[in-house]
UniProtKB/Swiss-Prot annotation:
Name assigned to this protein: Golgi-associated olfactory signaling regulator
GO cellular component: Golgi apparatus; Golgi membrane
Keywords tagged on the record: Glycoprotein, Golgi apparatus, Membrane, Olfaction, Sensory transduction, Signal, Transmembrane, Transmembrane helix
Localization per Swiss-Prot or TrEMBL: Golgi apparatus membrane
Disruption outcome: Various olfactory phenotypes, such as abnormal localization of ADCY3, shortened olfactory cilia, and reduced electrophysiological and behavioral sensitivities to odorants.
GO biological process, one term: sensory perception of smell
Stretches assigned to the Cytoplasmic side: 419-504
Organism of provenance: Mus musculus
Upper taxonomic lineage: Eukaryota, Metazoa, Chordata, Craniata, Vertebrata
Composition-biased stretches (Basic and acidic residues): 170-192
Region (Disordered): 36-365, 467-504
Glycosylation sites: N50
């Protein structure tokens, strides 16, 4: 991921520049700047040289292709992109035919920019063997894949051969796409990244497919780079980035043509591998936006024009948008794909309709709830106990609590009253004090008769002997002892020698 981070920053910068749709001529200096910026990042000098060789002659797209073909299968995506971009030599007249100024009308500039594209420079470096002209390219150009028949014999092998009908339009579109792709891809990126940007492959593919003669040859050249399963998806050859542009063009031009089915099937297979590429969203965006107009007019120029308008928008798209468009384009429906915009509008409408339908069920459910409420009310009317149950659950607990506390308090009060009454009628030892206010010290010297301990009524009669008898006298003190000796006492050693013989 480290090599990709600088590439993303450069791509964002280039996309911002492309959003304004500046003339292709300024695009070349930008490419030169990109080369200068990216070369320190590890781009080989050979790539820059190839790029400079590509720059001088925009019309030399046919001459440069010889660099392309013999790249290992890992570099095959680069090769395919270079073949595609260089092949569109016939594109100049097509681009001239298209009146739209958005395409950067000068075909020479567009081709020049496509040659200047770092993807070509990078591709030139990886491809060590010269590549024959796209028109003259034979299936032998693709060492790995079986050569496709130039006459569109096998649509699965060569997805572009199916697109031979829209080739003029695609051709016109391809130079523009190559221009857009040129600033996006930097030579450093291509040299470092085995899988070129999806936009590069798409633009190159569109260039190839757009040339009636070149498309066939390019298909043969591109197939080596693609999966060994050409039959499943003709565009699987372009797994990473080729699929979106060529598929979009056939959709816009010939929504009804059987070739669209092939292209869409290829696209579906290709979209999955290519979704990882950050730049591919632009191509998907183009597919989604352009098909609305081109589908209406099968004329080659109109789809090309729509392409021209869409590329600027697609370049500004972020990889997140790619994901949004990919599922739409991935549908295998050939005739329906030309109207992706209609399909995009379609899904929301069905969603809205279900939303509208949903309220009705909700209303019905509300009616059901009302009916249930009525039933509950009837129950309340018939039996009030049901209504009181919730209150009883809460209030009953409180009632029980207060009732229990009240009972306990009443019990304690009753016991206290009984105690007081019993204490008044019967006095026992605990009532020895004449008055509750008297201090116990006053009665310490009271005579302690057996009766006093058990029965004593101060309020009642007082025994005479207790009242008249004087208190007993204190006992006499013991005799005084002699005072203790003063001073230290003399100690005698108690030893056998000190003892007298008569001591026992």
């Amino acid at each position: 991921m480290q090599p990709f981070s600088p590439i993303f920053f450069h791509l964002l910068f280039l996309l911002n520049g492309l959003s304004s749709r500046a003339a292709p001529s300024p695009g070349q200096p930008v490419v030169a700047d990109l080369q200068g910026m990216l070369q320190p990042s590890g781009m080989p000098t050979g790539t820059l040289e190839n790029l400079t060789r590509d720059q001088p002659t925009p019309g030399s797209s046919a001459s440069h292709p010889p660099e392309h073909s013999e790249t290992p299968p890992s570099a095959s995506p680069h090769i395919s992109t270079k073949i595609l971009r260089e092949t569109p030599s016939p594109s100049p007249f097509l681009s001239l035919e298209t009146p739209i100024p958005d395409q950067l009308t000068s075909v020479a500039e567009s081709q020049g920019t496509s040659q200047m594209s770092p993807s070509r420079a990078t591709l030139g470096k990886p491809s060590e063997t010269p590549k024959p002209d796209p028109t003259g390219i034979s299936p032998s150009d693709s060492p790995e894949t079986p050569k496709p028949n130039p006459s569109n014999t096998s649509p699965p092998e060569s997805p572009e051969s199916v697109y031979t009908d829209p080739t003029p339009t695609l051709h016109h579109e391809s130079p523009e796409i190559s221009k857009r792709d040129t600033p996006k891809l930097s030579p450093g990126e291509e040299s470092k990244i085995p899988s070129p940007r999806p936009t590069q492959f798409l633009s190159s593919k569109s260039l190839e497919t757009y040339d009636p003669s070149a498309t066939r040859h390019l298909n043969s050249a591109l197939e080596p780079t693609t999966h060994p399963d050409p039959t499943e998806s003709p565009q699987s050859v372009f797994l990473t980035t080729h699929n979106s542009n060529p598929t979009v063009v056939p959709q816009t031009q010939f929504p009804t043509s059987p070739s669209q089915n092939v292209t869409e099937t290829a696209r579906t297979s290709d979209l999955e591998p290519s979704s990882s590429l950050p730049t591919q969203p632009t191509t998907f965006r183009e597919e989604a936006t352009t098909p609305s107009e081109p589908g209406l007019s099968p004329s080659p120029e109109a789809p090309a024009v729509t392409r021209v308008a869409t590329p600027g928008l697609s370049t500004s798209d972020s990889p997140g948008t790619k994901e949004l468009h990919v599922p739409q384009n991935s549908d295998p429906k050939g005739p329906d794909i030309p109207l992706p915009s209609a399909r995009i509008a379609g899904p929301p409408a069905p969603l809205e309709h279900p939303n509208q339908v949903a309220p009705a069920p909700q209303r019905h459910s509300r009616g059901d709830t009302v009916n249930t409420i009525i039933v509950v009310e009837r129950v309340k009317e018939t039996g009030v106990t049901l209504v009181s149950r919730p209150r009883g659950s809460v209030g009953g607990a409180l009632c029980l609590f207060f009732a229990g506390t009240g009972l306990l308090i009443g019990i304690f009060l009753l016991l206290w009253c009984l105690y007081r009454r019993a204490s008044r009628h019967r006095s026992f030892a605990h009532h020895r004090l004449r008055d509750s206010g008297d201090e116990p010290v006053l009665h310490l010297d009271a005579p302690k008769d057996p009766l006093d301990l058990y029965f004593y009524a101060p309020d009642a009669w007082v025994p005479s002997h207790i009242a008249t008898q004087p208190p007993p006298s204190t006992p006499p003190l013991p005799p005084k002892l002699p005072p203790p000796p003063r001073g230290p006492q003399r100690l005698e050693a108690l030893s056998p020698a000190a003892l007298s013989p008569n001591f026992f």
